[in-house]
């Protein structure tokens, strides 16, 4: 929030796109004087978010919206900030930043995280995996160029260290594998999903020096 230069002294209107269960949404509501529209296409995530918001005393600041990120019903120049953490890949980075720009007020801030290569060359095994899973993975300079082409001034960039992936994402996911399989009766489809996630985790543990989530902060011009 400091890097983005968000003004804590005035009310802000924020859209959190692909909010999930609201970890970032609730943090923003606590830290800023803000009204937040929390968007996700899974209603069960939004229900969990609402429970968390009430328990944290910020429910009145948050409105949930169950829809897809590529069919947002927002008005032009409606928001001061668009925030999207670990979700824009569902739409594609370039498509997302291009489509969402019109929802920002002049000078509004875009804050998004995106899987990003940390090195110019990668092992073939890793490159092949991400070419199939998400071909838009690229180095930060390429992502910054996309922002510039679509009417933004890049303000800051940083990447998340390995412990963020492991402690906050992969380890909690691993802890749920057995319960997930049990809940789905050890079905073939469930086992395929778990095997796929295990493969992704193994790749990250092996090649964490080559990629991470990059956080991009940009200003609409």
Residue ranges and their predicted role:
Residues 95-109:
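A short glycine-rich, Lys/Arg-flanked "PGG" loop and its adjoining helix->strand segment in the class I
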Residues 158-221:
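Conserved Class I S-adenosyl-L-methionine
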Residues 136-151:
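Short alpha-helix
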Residues 81-94:
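A short SAM/SAH-binding and catalytic strip from SAM-dependent methyltransferases
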Residues 15-17, 21-71:
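Class I SAM-dependent methyltransferase SAM/SAH-binding core
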Residues 115-134:
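Short, glycine-/aromatic-enriched active-site segment of Class I SAM-dependent methyltransferases
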Residues 1-10:
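Conserved alpha-helix/loop element of class I SAM-dependent methyltransferases that forms part
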Residues 70-81:
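A short acidic, Gly/Pro-enriched loop at the edge of an enzyme's catalytic core
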